[in-house]
Amino acid sequence: MITPYNEDRSVDYGAVRELVRWYWENGCDGIFASCQSSEIMFLSLEDRIKLASTVKDEADKLAADKSRSQMSVVASGHVSDDFKEQVKELCLMADTGVDAVVLISNRSDIENTSSEAWIADTEKLLNALPSHTMVGTYECPRPYKRLLADKMVEWIAKSGRFAFIKDTCCDALEIKKRIEMLAGSGVKLFNANGQTALEALKYGSDGYCGIMCNFHPKLYVWMCHNFKKYPEMAEKVGAVLSMCAFTESPTYPCTAKYHMNKYENITMSLYARSSQRQALTHYHQTWVDQMKLVCDSVYEQIKDLK
């Protein structure tokens, strides 16, 4: 989930609630708040916590609509180097009532020395959190991407503390191996990569959790729910999503904010703290416009296939 800002560059919590409703209306099964897309490295602790709390509050209000299952809300805000500060920010996040607190993989064994050191650091962190706290882990690309080695995945599967992994390895065969390693553990795997989304689903991933759901979540929702029932159409949808996902890097999240303003009637500043607003050129805006045109056309072909 992105963080919308006011023109004075403070967090726009009204727009945050509008975004939650938009994800709901587009069929999303859950929201990852206070994540990298939320620019957590550039938010104060107060805003990291308030962002997750606001998202959870709005999702709970929407749950009164019994026409569909409640959206899960997970959140991280895990950015500190110091161990005590990590415990503080994660405990405060747990207090918001989110369904799971997400540990960022590069915050354990920060010097990236070994799998054993990572496991020891993560175990120490888990022991400092309330025992009832549901946790996930996320291979966040910033400040550097710490991919989970096999030994780390095996430990996660056996620990009994983890609910899921947000996978950013961007390698379908590696995802397949991880899914096999997690089998029977109850730990789910959500893939963040659009290019491997369909292939990963075929291997048994539990869904897609990535930034392109800020542009065309309906297509991902449809594919995740229907790829087995309509395999031929799923291949076509997956191919379109794969191509669209190549737009995820340039000037994001400004591109997503441009999309929300122009196409989703959610007003917010195009300002971002992690990307230069000036870099959102007409060229990049045209990418978003063309992507919207193509994805709307695809959705018209699948909207009645349920």
Region spans (language model):
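Repeat-unit-sized solenoid/scaffold elements
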Residues: 103-121, 166-183, 205-207, 287-293
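Active-site beta->alpha loop and helix N-cap motifs at the rims of alpha/beta catalytic domains
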Residues: 2-147
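Short secondary-structure transition/capping segments
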Residues: 43-46, 113-116, 177-178, 202, ...
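Residue-level detector of family-conserved "landmark" positions at structurally sensitive sites
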Residues: 33, 103, 210, 270-271
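C-terminal alpha-helical cap/extension of soluble enzyme domains
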Residues: 1-2, 26, 97, 205, ...
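Short, conserved catalytic or adaptor-binding loops enriched in Gly and charged residues
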Residues: 63-66, 156, 181-182, 263-264
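Domain-wide signal for the mature, well-folded portions of proteins, strongly enriched
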Residues: 8, 12, 45-46, 56-60, ...
